[in-house]
Amino acid sequence: MIYIIRHGQTDWNIEHRTQGQTDIALNKNGIEQAELITQKIANLKIDNIISSDLKRAYMTAQIINKKFNKTIETDKRLREFCFGTLEGITRDKITQEIWDDFNKNAKQFNAETKEEIFNRIKSFIDDIKSNNINKNTLVVTHGGPIRMIKYYLDNGDNFNDKKYLAEYMTLKINNLDIFIIDEKMNLKRYDL
């Protein structure tokens, strides 16, 4: 089984700032959230933990790992999407027109394209499928990669920008939501 958790809360989450790959730590509430989720998942059998290397995910993994006592492997492929020059800006300052421009040409914002993100997430999932057979793996990452993981598992190798934007970009993922990839490689919310 593969369990996937979104990191705990940051100040930028509260401020509705676009975080992207800006390295923001958990706030006090985020630390408490991670401690609470650790209690809720304490009965899971976890063989290994893989985390995004960004502070908010890694701190979440460290707090959870106090229960499981595993070596935390970091993987840059699990980083949040790079939003380039839009990082740090509050959502109310980013108009729909700016988002539309961003979705048409992310490079003009010094950001990753969705195809680049898809390829790194695909690479991660393919590696974890082949290298973690018969292991229960806990992955700590961000909302964007979780959406892209779902897209890849639902649609396979062919990335379609319009389909992703229409069907997956709006998937609501809260801090410390848990998902599971089952034996059939379907991503589902994990209810405790």
PLM features per residue range, with description:
Residues 157-188:
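Domain-level recognition of soluble alpha/beta enzyme cores
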Residues 143-147, 177:
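GST superfamily/GST-like fold recognition
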Residues 25, 66-123:
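Phosphate-handling substructures
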Residues 43-45, 128-135:
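Glycine-rich phosphate-binding loop signature in dinucleotide/nucleotide-binding domains
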Residues 1-3, 48:
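Extreme N-terminal starter segment of soluble prokaryotic enzymes
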